[in-house]
């Protein structure tokens, strides 16, 4: 785990693909929070005991930028921001099967069991044979939002075992081991200063290789 930034209030990390954010049934060890609490013991009492410092999440297979709270005040502030979505900026890079018909566009529709509104903007950055590199910017933070919307575009994420196309995955030269989705940029208002801060993490090698 690479720490991108750390101060008295927050710690920002580049989450590796395959790491769980917090312990869960069947995954009691090896989480990011376990490592963070070892490095910053004060985080053990921030938020809930099961999810210390956690104010948002990424899927286990998704890599990229995450912020954790180091104090209870920062935790409450950031939780409020992530729940309202108004001050949060999120950008992702993904490798898709095929490419959307339009170079850029927006999907605005319900996702998930509760059919909550989800707004996703996309822009095609590059096309490489049977796949494309697409930047997603989301205004909401619904579970599997990008993965669902990409599938609705007819261009599921490469390596997505839930919403993807296993037959197409098998025909690719890269043999994906995970869904190729990376949280490349995260911005929010710093819980103490109130200033907008932005953090970025370069895409990992498997994503780069897929569109090289």
Summary of predicted features, one role per range:
Residues 1-212:
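RNA pseudouridine synthases
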